[in-house]
Amino acid sequence: MTDTTKIGLKETGCITGYHAHVYFDADTVEQALVLCQRAAEIFGVKMGRVHDKLVGPHPMWSCQLAADPEQFAQLLPWLALNRDGLIVFAHPETGDELADHRDHGIWLGTGLELDLSLFA
């Protein structure tokens, strides 16, 4: 069997959790709120504040869902099926915020440009 670290592959044991950021605007805030509340109810994930302003590296208003790896395995497909046009950006938490946002992110819908300058 090949040692994956010798060919640059990373082990997933460094992932302590995931964040899924649901993006919205003034017209879709209610839709995003319902989606995030249902996700929290169904999967037991932690729902963060609903930000009706830009926060962190995010280019749109957003609400964060925080999940452990087991929850995320169920949450991501559910978000894919139920986002109804909302954009979702998800990333692992490995302790390297820049790489997690820049290199390890998953987009549901149109990928947007993040402001990564705060991780420099």
Question: Model-derived features: where do they sit?
Answer:
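Long, contiguous binding/interaction regions
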Residues: 1-120
